[in-house]
């Protein structure tokens, strides 16, 4: 399998960092997946989404989650996020402690060039 960078220099990551009600962790994940995999998720319809998001659970604190994805345009992400928050209001949000589901954004300033990853992959063979 070829090595690929997690994200590309010049793009952005959205990083949601939040806690879920400890009594509803499984419910949260189920509802998140139902919304995320549905045709009703406008994030997946945007050409500004470069790589689809991943939902990660903290191994030390099972109530803590991160949602991370790569986008080329953070204004476009913020515009769609506002639609989610104000119009669609997905059911999984009710299990987030404090109800805050707003990301921080990070600019990707370094990403290993593909030719170096290809060389590293060849060396593993």
Task: Label each region the model flagged.
Residues 19-32:
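Short, surface-exposed ligand-recognition loops at beta-strand->loop->(often short) alpha-helix junctions
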Residues 61-65:
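A short, glycine/Asx- and small/polar-enriched loop/turn
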Residues 34-51, 60, 70-106:
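An amphipathic, aromatic/His-enriched active-site/gating alpha helix that lines ligand/cofactor pockets
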Residues 17, 107-108:
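Short amphipathic
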Residues 1-12, 108, 112-125:
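Eukaryotic N-terminal low-complexity, Ser/Thr- and Lys/Arg-rich leader segments
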Residues 11-19, 66:
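Active-site-flanking beta-strand signature of metal-NTP-handling nucleotidyl enzymes
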Residues 21-23, 72-74, 110:
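Short coil/turn motifs at secondary-structure junctions
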Residues 1-2, 51-54:
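Short structured motifs
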């Amino acid at each position: 399998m070829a090595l690929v960078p997690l994200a590309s220099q010049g793009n952005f990551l959205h990083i949601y960092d939040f806690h879920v009600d400890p009594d509803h962790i499984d419910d949260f994940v189920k509802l998140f997946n139902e919304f995320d995999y549905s045709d009703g998720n406008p994030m997946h319809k945007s050409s500004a989404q470069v790589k689809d998001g991943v939902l990660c659970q903290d191994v030390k604190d099972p109530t803590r989650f991160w949602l991370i994805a790569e986008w080329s345009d953070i204004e476009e992400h913020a515009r769609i996020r506002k639609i989610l928050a104000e119009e669609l209001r997905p059911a999984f949000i009710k299990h987030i402690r404090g109800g805050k589901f707003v990301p921080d954004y990070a600019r990707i300033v370094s990403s290993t060039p593909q030719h170096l990853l290809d060389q590293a992959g060849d060396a593993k063979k």
